[in-house]
Amino acid sequence: MDNRLRNAAEVNYIDIAMPDVKGNTVKLSEVEGKVVMVYFWASENAEQKMFNLDVVKPVYADYKDKGFEIYAVSLDTDKAKWATTVRNQELDWINVCDGRGSASPVVTTYNVQSIPSLFFLVDGDLVSSTGVRNEATLRSFLAAHLR
């Protein structure tokens, strides 16, 4: 049996391990936070860049000290461009990318159909995030789970 599937039985999600901007491998299972948002995106997309600035950054600033963390998985194929975007936008949450784009195994594993795609781990358990698509719904979700 695949190790990823064995680990999934222990947690209810399949772990991700990818390099960050500095080249260090960061595992999703090692991220600390009461609520961890697994955020699939691509820096190649202008709308995604605006989503980072208009939605994700302000919400992260308000909730990061309350137990909220982000594990952002870029589906870019140009890792240098992705890293530049992360630095230029000052995205100070966890950002990882394997450079394989839509061919990355995590796309299939997490059934990513479109970007942005958001999944949430609450106290280590994967929970439904249906309807979380903008700042108001993200804030509402976090307010309900970060009590």
Question: Which residues are covered by each model-predicted region?
Answer:
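Short, contiguous acidic/charged loop-to-helix segments that flank catalytic cores in large enzymes
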Residues: 25-28, 41-50, 70-75, 96-98, ...
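Loop/turn elements at helix/coil->beta-strand transitions in domains of secreted/extracellular proteins
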Residues: 32-35, 65-68, 90-92
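Structural microenvironment flanking redox-active thiols in thiol-disulfide oxidoreductases
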Residues: 49-88, 102-107
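N-proximal helix/coil linker or "cap" segments that precede and/or mark the start of modular domains
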Residues: 1-19, 29-32, 61, 80, ...
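Hydrophobic beta-strand anchors of alpha/beta hydrolase catalytic cores
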Residues: 37-38, 70, 118
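Conserved redox-active cysteine motifs that mediate thiol-disulfide chemistry
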Residues: 33, 37-57
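Short gly/ser/thr-rich secondary-structure transition/capping motifs
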Residues: 17-23, 97-101
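Thiol/disulfide oxidoreductase modules built on the thioredoxin-like
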Residues: 91, 102-143
